[in-house]
UniProtKB/Swiss-Prot annotation:
GO terms for biological process: ribosome biogenesis. This is GTPase Obg. GTP binds at residues 165-172, 190-194, 215-218, 285-288, 315-317. Signal peptide: none annotated. The gene is obg. It is an enzyme of class 3 (hydrolase). Residues 159-334 form the OBG-type G domain. Its main location: cytoplasm.
Length: 335
C-alpha cells in the first residue's frame, strides 16, 4: 500500500554530562580543576528530495532518536557531539505537531532542510566554575535533554500532471502509454489502489526535463465526503500543475460520459474551490470503441455542454491522439 501518512515520535540526543576532574602532574601536587564539558546532543533534521516518492522507508517505525553527546573528560577535553539524524522525505511533505496540530513546515522544493528537534546542550565541567574566589570547584552539571516531538508526516504529491477520472475510465492504460511503463490494468474498477508516478518525455527539445505524471486512484461520487477513501486521493491533486480528466467517451450503465465529467468537476470544487482555477484538459478516452462519425457527435455534445473546456479525442489503448495531448502538455507546462 502507498504510504502517504505516518506519525513518529522524534527525540533529539541528550547533551553529555560535564565532569569533575583534577590536574595531576608530578610538580603540581595542588593542580586545579581539569574537567571538560559534555558534547551537544545530535539534532533531528528533515530534508526533502525528489528521488523519494513515499514514506515507505519509515513503515512500521514509531520512534526515532538522534545520538547523545558524550560526557566531558579530563585535561579539559569536551565530549564528542552526538551525530545528527537526517530523515529524507518526498517533496510535498507536510509536517504537523500531533499535540498542538500546528503545521510545522511544508516542503515544496528539493533540498529543503528543517531542524525539527534540537539536541540538548552539554553540561559544564568543573573547570568552567573556577573563579578567583573558588579555585577548586567540585561542581559539574548534567547535559540537557534534547527536544521531543510527536510529528505527523503527510504527503501531498507534487507532479506536473495529475490523471483524474472514475474507475474504469482507462486512466492506467493511458498512463502506461504516456509514461511508457506498465502499471497493472484490468477490466474492473479500482485497478489502481495507490498513486503511481511516471515520467512523460517532453516533445519540446529546448525543455529537456520530462513531465512528472501521477495516476490518482479512481474518484467516485461523494469522494469529497471521503467515500471510497476520496479525501486520501483528492489531496494528491492539490499540488499538480495541470489536471488531465480522463472520461470514458462511451459512458457506462450508471451514467452518461457528460454526467461523469460534471460529477468530477463538482467533486473537485466541493473538496477545494480553488481547484476550479487549475489548468485542465479533458481526455475523451476509448475512441477506438466508436466509429469516426460517433466520435465527432460525442465531441460536439461535450463542447455544447462545457464550452470553456479543452477536449482531446484519444485512445490510451491504441495511442491515437496521444501526440496531440503531448503537444498540449508542452503548451501548458513549458513556461
Amino acid at each position: 500500500m502507498f504510504l502517504d501518512r505516518i506519525t513518529i515520535e522524534l527525540r533529539a540526543g541528550k547533551g553529555g554530562n560535564g565532569v569533575v576532574a583534577w590536574r595531576k602532574e608530578k610538580y603540581l601536587p595542588k593542580g586545579g580543576p581539569y574537567g571538560g564539558n559534555g558534547g551537544v546532543g545530535g539534532s533531528i533534521i528533515i530534508e526533502s528530495a525528489t528521488h523519494v516518492y513515499s514514506f515507505e522507508s519509515y513503515r512500521n517505525i514509531r520512534f526515532l532518536k538522534a545520538e547523545d553527546g558524550q560526557a566531558g573528560a579530563t585535561n579539559n577535553r569536551s565530549g564528542r557531539n552526538g551525530k545528527d539524524l537526517v530523515l529524507v522525505v518526498p517533496e510535498g511533505t507536510l509536517l504537523r505537531d500531533v499535540e498542538t496540530q500546528e503545521i510545522l513546515y511544508d516542503f515544496t522544493k528539493d533540498g529543503e532542510r528543517l531542524v525539527i528537534c534540537r539536541g540538548g546542550k552539554g553540561g559544564k565541567g568543573n573547570t568552567f566554575f573556577k573563579t578567583s574566589t573558588n579555585r577548586a570547584p567540585t561542581k559539574a552539571t548534567p547535559g540537557k535533554p534534547g527536544e521531543v516531538r510527536q510529528v505527523e508526516f503527510e504527503l501531498k504529491l507534487i507532479a506536473d500532471i495529475g490523471l483524474v477520472g472514475f474507475p474504469n475510465a482507462g486512466k492506467s492504460t493511458l498512463f502506461n502509454t504516456l509514461a511508457r511503463t506498465e502499471v497493472r490494468v484490468g477490466a474492473y474498477p479500482f485497478t489502481t489502489l495507490q498513486p503511481v508516478l511516471g515520467l512523460v518525455p517532453c516533445q519540446e527539445k529546448l525543455y529537456q526535463k520530462p513531465w512528472i505524471i501521477a495516476d490518482i486512484p479512481g474518484i467516485i461520487e461523494g469522494a469529497h465526503q471521503n467515500r471510497g477513501l476520496g479525501l486520501d486521493f483528492l489531496k494528491h491533486i492539490e499540488r499538480t500543475r495541470l489536471l488531465l480528466f480522463v472520461i470514458d467517451i462511451c459512458g457506462c450503465e450508471r451514467s452518461s460520459p457528460e454526467e461523469d465529467l460534471r460529477i468530477l468537476i463538482d467533486e473537485l470544487l466541493h473538496y477545494k474551490e480553488n481547484l476550479a482555477d487549475k489548468s485542465r484538459i479533458i481526455a475523451l478516452n476509448k475512441i477506438d470503441d466508436l466509429l469516426p462519425d460517433e466520435r465527432q457527435e460525442r465531441l460536439e455534445s461535450f463542447q455544447r455542454l462545457f464550452p470553456s473546456e479543452k477536449f482531446v479525442l484519444l485512445s490510451g489503448l491504441t495511442g491515437e491522439g496521444v501526440d496531440l495531448l503531448n503537444s498540449l502538455f508542452t503548451n501548458r507546462l513549458a513556461i
